[in-house]
């Protein structure tokens, strides 16, 4: 059994309980009213679940925007539904920092004690603590594989039980919670009056508690659960037990950020009751009119034609590990980018193939443009003024889209339109290979396309060709020399000179084995993820993603 001595809340508890910090101005809003913060205006208008409209995103500090993210309950492998939510918020975080100059301090809570964890641990005949550690590490590995940036800090519930106890004590002292004879502690929703329901506008009602519970009102929710046989427990003034679900996030967020939080995020299914109850707890604890300024919610990942949420309870899920065996994280990220983070998204092979096709087209354009810049792709003049103008319009369109509730759909469309026009210019240039070349504008277009995808976490340039290989630069040079040597052999085999008809035919026949060897080398390299393209008078090469055979241009 677990036993942790109760400690006082310490300085953080006094600081957090002082109430609202200065620097908020009143603003008209629906229902309970929303207080528009003052501070650093990011330049973004974001859909705020508190107001159900797009509000200016104003954070307390540009160099330390506070963001709390609900983390996983670690009892099993994470699935694509989880991946979709975390990837979408990772994209937003990257955009905030890399486009709008806002340094994000993100904290993620890890629920490592819970009914599901206890039940699964009993099924596997292991301790809840060891099970939770196993799947916590599994979750972190999945996030790294998806290229989701880690939060500034992960905080486990089990390592903050004393602070949770102190938080509950203050709620009781403030008249917002009560202890029962059975040793349970509940939040008294009646004490909030009409201030409950800020987020989703629902009236208090019974949520997930047994009918025969010892609550005063059916709508009250558990802050502390009395210990049961064969379950982990901690000591408290009300007897042995463990924390309820909602109080965990409220305590952890307050521990780090105090009485004011800039951004709170999670899946749309967490809006009620979880986030609604967090708001009630924190505003009762801090005695403030507004604790969290912006609540962002991501839509579900749906299967079966959009009618069913992907979830473990419905047994219709695909684990992240299984998915990544056949699909690259870049394809999945582009799949997520092609819908609003707030909307439900249908999981289908068709949608993934479309994302893969777009990534392939972008990678091919970048490689062709680089070949043109290196002089390996024959080409003539490009309509520079047209391409420069399109590049400027694209940059402005991307900036405007991202400032409008992180509209990645419009941003991706704008970039793909630029790629389309760049391809058209390259094709026209290759059809008329005479005249002056125009590499500068194509270089600027490639840099802009790569910058956008790097900003949102999609890799177009894979610097390491083969896993476990030595220096990527050395390998690059080796392949470059090999392709150059092959090109010379191929050009020699195809050259007929001034020989007459029969002599020319005989010469080509004699050199046929050289062409066959060149083709064999191309096939052999393709097996190892290197694709060679023979062009008129030149040959270029590119890397292939071994899971998808999509080209990945070299940096």
From Swiss-Prot:
Zn(2+) binds at residues 70, 249, 274, 278. L-cysteine binds at residues 71, 111, 274. Binds 1 zinc ion per subunit. Its cofactor is Zn(2+). InterPro entries: Cys-tRNA-ligase (IPR015803), Cys-tRNA/MSH_ligase (IPR024909), Rossmann-like_a/b/a_fold (IPR014729), tRNA-synt_1_cat_dom (IPR032678), tRNAsynth_Ia_anticodon-bd (IPR009080). GO terms for cellular component: cytoplasm; mitochondrion. Keywords: Aminoacyl-tRNA synthetase, ATP-binding, Ligase, Metal-binding, Mitochondrion, Nucleotide-binding, Protein biosynthesis, Transit peptide, Zinc. It catalyses: tRNA(Cys) + L-cysteine + ATP = L-cysteinyl-tRNA(Cys) + AMP + diphosphate; 2 L-cysteine = S-sulfanyl-L-cysteine + L-alanine; S-sulfanyl-L-cysteine + L-cysteine = S-disulfanyl-L-cysteine + L-alanine; S-sulfanyl-L-cysteine + tRNA(Cys) + ATP = (S)-sulfanyl-L-cysteinyl-tRNA(Cys) + AMP + diphosphate. ATP binds at residue 312. Transmembrane segments: none annotated. Its EC number is 6.1.1.16. Its main location: mitochondrion. Mitochondrial cysteine-specific aminoacyl-tRNA synthetase that catalyzes the ATP-dependent ligation of cysteine to tRNA(Cys). Belongs to the class-I aminoacyl-tRNA synthetase family. 'KIIK' region and 'KMSKS' region are required for cysteine persulfide synthase activity. This is Cysteine--tRNA ligase, mitochondrial. It comes from Bos taurus (Bovine). The gene is CARS2.
């Amino acid at each position: 059994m677990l036993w942790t001595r109760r400690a006082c809340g310490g300085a953080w508890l006094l600081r957090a309980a002082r109430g609202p910090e200065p620097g908020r101005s009143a603003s008209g809003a629906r229902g309970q009213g929303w207080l528009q913060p003052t501070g650093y205006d990011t330049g973004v208008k974001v859909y705020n679940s508190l107001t159900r409209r797009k509000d200016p995103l104003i954070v307390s500090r540009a160099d330390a925007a506070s963001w709390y993210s609900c983390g996983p309950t670690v009892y099993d492998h994470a699935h694509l539904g989880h991946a979709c939510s975390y990837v979408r918020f990772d994209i937003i975080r990257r955009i905030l920092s890399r486009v709008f100059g806002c340094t994000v301090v993100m904290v993620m809570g890890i629920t490592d004690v819970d009914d599901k964890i206890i039940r699964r641990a009993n099924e596997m005949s292991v301790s809840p603590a060891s099970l939770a550690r196993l799947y916590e590490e599994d979750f972190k590995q999945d996030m790294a594989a998806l290229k989701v940036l880690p939060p500034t800090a992960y905080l486990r519930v089990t390592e903050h039980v004393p602070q949770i106890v102190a938080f509950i004590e203050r709620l009781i002292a403030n008249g917002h919670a009560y202890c029962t004879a059975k040793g349970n502690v509940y939040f008294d929703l009646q004490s909030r009056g009409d201030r409950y329901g800020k987020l989703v506008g629902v009236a208090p009602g019974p949520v997930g508690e047994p009918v025969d519970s010892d609550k005063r009102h059916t709508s009250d929710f558990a802050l502390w659960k009395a210990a049961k046989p064969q379950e982990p427990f901690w000591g408290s003034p009300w007897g042995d037990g463990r924390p309820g679900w909602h109080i965990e996030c409220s305590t952890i967020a307050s521990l780090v950020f105090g009485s004011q939080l800039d951004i709170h995020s999670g899946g749309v299914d967490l809006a009620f009751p979880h986030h609604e109850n967090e708001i009630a707890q924190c505003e009762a604890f801090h005695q403030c009119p507004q604790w969290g300024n912006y609540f962002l919610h991501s839509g579900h990942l749906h299967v079966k034609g959009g009618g069913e949420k992907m979830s473990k309870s419905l047994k219709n899920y695909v684990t992240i590990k299984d998915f990544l065996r056949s699909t690259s994280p870049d394809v999945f990220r582009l799949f997520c980018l092609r819908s609003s983070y707030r909307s439900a998204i249908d999981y289908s092979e068709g949608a993934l193939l479309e994302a893969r096709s777009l990534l392939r087209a972008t990678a091919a354009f970048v490689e062709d443009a680089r070949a043109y810049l290196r002089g390996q792709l024959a080409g003539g003049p490009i309509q520079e003024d047209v391409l420069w103008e399109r590049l400027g319009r694209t940059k402005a369109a991307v900036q405007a889209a991202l400032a409008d509730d992180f509209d990645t759909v419009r941003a991706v469309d704008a970039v793909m339109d630029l790629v389309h026009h760049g391809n058209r210019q390259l094709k026209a240039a290759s059809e008329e290979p005479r005249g002056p070349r125009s590499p500068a504008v194509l270089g600027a277009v490639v840099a802009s396309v790569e910058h956008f995808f790097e900003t949102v976490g999609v890799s177009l340039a894979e610097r390491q060709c083969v896993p476990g290989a030595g220096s990527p630069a050395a390998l690059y040079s080796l392949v470059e020399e090999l392709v150059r040597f092959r090109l010379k052999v191929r050009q020699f085999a195809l050259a007929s000179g001034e020989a007459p008809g029969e002599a020319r035919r005989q010469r080509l026949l004699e050199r046929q084995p050289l062409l066959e060897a060149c083709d064999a080398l191309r096939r052999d390299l393709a097996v190892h993820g290197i694709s060679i393209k023979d062009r008129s008078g030149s040959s270029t090469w590119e890397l292939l993603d071994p899971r998808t055979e999509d080209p990945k241009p070299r940096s």
